[in-house]
Swiss-Prot record:
It holds the Pfam family Ribosomal_L32p. GO terms for molecular function: structural constituent of ribosome. NCBIfam families: rpmF_bact (TIGR01031). The lineage of its organism: Bacteria, Bacillati, Actinomycetota, Actinomycetes, Micrococcales. This is Large ribosomal subunit protein bL32. Coiled coil: none annotated.
Amino acid sequence: MAVPKRKMSRANTRARRSQWKATAPTLVKSVENGRVSYRLPHQAELKTDAAGTPLFLEYKGRKVADA
């Protein structure tokens, strides 16, 4: 296992750490029953009725599972 030869300064440590960035997920807009919702792409979407009761999961326009 690699071991640092010298202690890394606080400035260098913080400069290195500043490169760690979280990226915001890309969302897909979908409209269902007049409501706009955003979801992750390439994942099954939960379809609900007007009252909000979950009915089934849909992917690429096909029913893939019951809720």
